[in-house]
Amino acid sequence: DYIVEAIEAEGGVVFAKSNTPEFEAGANTFNEVFGRTLNPWNLSRSAGGSSGGAAVAVATGMAFVAQGSDFACSLRYPAAFCNVVGLRPTPGVVPQ
């Protein structure tokens, strides 16, 4: 993975994989293996999808930064739901 290699080349440590929905797409972060990812500020609400696990990890302090994709706002929605910043790079700047 290009992003992982770039992070490690700069001295970063990739230490975990957060929860994502099956096929990495969906309005909620849910899968049959790990279940639903809950909003850290209100457990009755969604963390959004599909990068909900990444947004929760940042919101709760488990990670300083997280990487995800933004197909159909799947990075920006979880960021907004979990009150963290989600940045969508300019298309073509970050290899897919």
Cite the ranges covered by each PLM segment.
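Gly/Ser-rich catalytic/binding loops embedded in alpha/beta enzyme cores
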Residues: D1-A72
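A short core secondary-structure module
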Residues: A66, P91-Q96
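Glycine-rich, flexible loop motifs
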Residues: L87
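Structural signature of FAD isoalloxazine-binding scaffolds in flavoprotein oxidoreductases
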Residues: R76-F81
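Short glycine-enriched loops at secondary-structure junctions
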Residues: N19-P21, T90-V93
